[in-house]
Regions:
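N-terminal helicase ATP-binding lobe
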Residues: 1-233
Length: 233
C-alpha cells in the first residue's frame, strides 16, 4: 500500500484517489493487522475505522471475497457505510447496510452479491442462526467497539462461527478502551479469536501531531424553579 508523498495521500487500487490522508501510525497498525487476528487499540478520534478500511481494501484486492464490518448501533453502521462509500472505489450498491429494518429475505440476497456488508451484530447473529447467510467467503471481519465482546453478546457467537466456517480468515477488532485489566483484554482476545494486540496512545510520536488539547470552559447557570424544588424537596 503506497503513499503519495507529494500530496500526503495513500495510493491503492481500491481507494478513492487523494482521499485517505497518509498517517504513519495508521499504516503501521494496518500492516500489523494484515498479519493476523488483531486487536487494535487507538484513542477516539484518531481513525480506528480508517485502519480497518485499509486492511479491508488490501484483503479484497489480494484475496477477494467479502468484508464484514460490525458495529453495535444503527448510527455507527450508517456512519461507517458513508465513509466506506466515499473512501473506496467500489460501487455503492456493493457496500450494503444490514439493520433490523432490512427484511431477512432481502438480507440473504444482498449478502450474496455484496463486496462489503456493514451491520449490527444482532442481525448477523439472527441470519446465521436462521441459516440465511454463510461466512465462508468473508475474508475480513471487523468488530467495532470490540470491548462489547463478552458474555452472550452477539460478537462472541459470530466470532465462533467465523473461525469455524470462513475459508480465508482475518479478524480486526477495534476499541479505544478494550478493558481496564490484562484479564479483561485477554477475555476479549479469547472470545473473538485474536492472536495479537496493537496499541498506540496519544503519547506516541507518530500520533501526537494529530491530537489537540481540549479547552474546557465552565459556566454557571441558574436552575429553573422546578429543578430547585426537586433538589430542595
Amino acid at each position: 500500500m503506497a503513499a503519495t508523498e507529494d500530496v500526503g495521500y495513500i495510493d491503492h487500487p481500491l481507494l478513492t484517489e487523494a482521499f485517505i490522508e497518509r498517517r504513519l501510525y495508521q499504516l503501521q497498525l494496518a500492516d500489523a493487522a494484515k498479519q493476523g487476528h488483531t486487536l487494535v487499540c487507538l484513542p477516539t478520534g484518531l481513525g480506528k475505522t480508517t485502519v480497518s478500511l485499509l486492511v479491508t481494501a488490501e484483503r479484497l484486492e489480494a484475496v477477494g471475497g467479502t468484508a464484514l464490518l460490525l458495529a453495535p448501533t444503527k448510527p455507527l453502521v450508517q456512519q461507517h457505510a458513508e465513509f466506506y462509500r466515499e473512501a473506496l472505489q467500489i460501487p455503492d450498491d456493493k457496500i450494503v447496510v444490514f439493520t433490523g429494518e432490512v427484511r431477512p429475505e432481502d438480507r440473504a440476497e444482498l449478502f450474496e452479491s455484496a463486496k462489503i456488508v456493514i451491520a449490527t451484530p444482532q442481525v448477523i447473529e439472527n441470519d446465521l442462526v436462521g441459516n440465511r447467510i454463510s461466512l465462508a467467503d468473508v475474508t475480513h471481519l471487523t468488530f467495532d467497539e470490540c470491548h462489547r465482546g463478552t458474555g452472550d453478546y452477539a460478537y462472541v457467537y459470530i466470532a465462533e462461527r467465523y473461525h469455524a466456517d470462513a475459508e480465508e480468515q482475518l479478524v480486526t477488532a477495534m476499541s479505544a478502551s478494550p478493558g481496564g485489566t490484562k484479564e479483561d483484554i485477554q477475555t476479549i482476545c479469547d472470545n473473538l479469536g485474536l492472536d495479537g494486540v496493537e496499541v498506540m496512545t496519544e503519547d506516541d510520536a507518530d500520533v501526537d501531531e494529530f491530537t489537540h488539547d481540549t479547552d474546557v470552559e465552565w459556566k454557571r447557570t441558574d436552575l429553573p424553579q422546578e429543578l430547585l424544588d426537586i433538589r430542595d424537596g
